[in-house]
């Protein structure tokens, strides 16, 4: 779990900007990673159409295993993360920050548990859970109670944000815990990211051996593949014979709903593509928004398949 973490932090804590953020592709499009200009133009037009039909604001980023931005829509605009931050929190825990080990115990206070927390509630009788089980369940079932317990262990939202800064991401920020982080107030930068920044940070955590060692990267990927919350969103548009995982997010505040999903997929064993889908204030949530996510997944898959 510890691996190269000390060297990683020493190398990256150099003004927080050592790793360049991917830029938002601008018009006119250029060929990217063997994908034709025409294919990119068609994909962009499809995203514009999806946004119009949604009645809300759509953020998308598709990044290849090497970090090339293949597609984006509102890629540098801020969106609430909702529960998608939990993948980064799990990655931070796997890095062994603050000496955390998977078998360490976290004490549960039932009175402090809010919202969706199926695993935490299943542990009320025992009164504790392990760090490893908490990290697994914040990804696979998006457990809020486990997320808050882990935040307590890593220095709170500020601690996670500082870890993200050390990855070279100066955009993504977590300011509050569950459930407050889901407020999604208009113009409020708290608990937000951009599709491009988030996609690149996701990619690094899942692919860069200076962040996590191979065993921990594989563990995090397996949790994402096992996730149960996003089967009808991005995954529904990605071919079933590709390896795919995802982490969803849902901000449910009245008048400020956001439907999110961040997927990783590997068509042929060549590494993880990262696909970010943020849908802010759509006219409907539920199956309607999920179906739009599936369309975005299909657009991304078609684009990757079109590469020469």
Segment roles from a protein language model:
Residues 65, 103-121, 154-155, 181, ...:
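Acidic helix-start/capping segments at beta-turn-to-alpha-helix junctions
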Residues 68, 80-108, 138, 275:
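Active-site SXXK
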Residues 57-58, 135, 148-207:
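Mid-domain, small-residue-enriched loop/turn segments at the edges of structured enzyme/sensor domains
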Residues 95-113, 157, 161, 213-216:
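Short, well-structured active-site flanking segments
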Residues 15-17:
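C-terminal motif of bacterial Sec signal peptides marking the signal peptidase cleavage site
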Residues 113-150, 157:
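Conserved catalytic neighborhood of penicillin-recognizing serine enzymes
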Residues 56-78:
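Short, conserved catalytic-motif segment at the N-terminal edge
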Residues 19-50, 66, 70, 153, ...:
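Structured C-terminal helix/loop/strand segments within mature extracytoplasmic catalytic/sensor domains
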């Amino acid at each position: 779990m510890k691996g190269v973490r000390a060297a990683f932090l020493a190398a990256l804590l150099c003004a927080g900007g050592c790793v360049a953020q991917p830029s938002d592709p601008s018009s006119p499009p250029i060929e990217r990673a063997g994908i034709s200009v025409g294919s990119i133009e068609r994909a962009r037009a499809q995203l514009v159409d999806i946004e119009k039909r949604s009645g809300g604001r759509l953020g998308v980023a598709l990044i290849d295993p090497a970090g090339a931005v293949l597609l984006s829509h509102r890629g540098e605009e801020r969106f609430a993360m909702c529960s998608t931050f939990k993948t980064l929190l799990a990655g931070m825990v796997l890095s062994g920050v603050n000496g955390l080990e998977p078998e360490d115990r976290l004490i549960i206070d039932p009175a402090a548990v809010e919202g969706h927390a199926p695993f935490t509630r299943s542990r009320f009788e025992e009164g504790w859970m392990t760090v490893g089980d908490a990290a697994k369940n914040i990804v696979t079932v998006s457990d809020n109670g486990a997320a808050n317990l882990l935040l307590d262990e890593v220095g709170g939202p500020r601690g996670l944000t500082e870890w993200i800064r050390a990855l070279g991401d100066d955009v993504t920020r977590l300011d509050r815990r569950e459930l407050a982080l889901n407020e999604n107030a208009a113009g409020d930068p708290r608990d937000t990211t951009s599709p491009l920044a988030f996609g690149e940070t996701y990619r690094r955590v899942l692919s860069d051996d200076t962040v996590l060692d191979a065993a921990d990267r594989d563990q995090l990927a397996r949790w994402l593949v096992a996730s149960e919350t996003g089967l009808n969103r991005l995954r529904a548009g990605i071919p079933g014979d590709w390896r795919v995982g995802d982490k969803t997010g849902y901000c449910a505040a009245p008048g400020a709903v956001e439907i999110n999903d961040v997927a990783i997929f590997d068509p042929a064993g060549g590494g993880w593509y990262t696909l970010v889908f943020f849908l802010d204030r759509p006219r409907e949530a539920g199956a309607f928004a999920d179906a739009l996510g599936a369309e975005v997944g299909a657009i991304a898959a078609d684009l990757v398949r079109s590469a020469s």
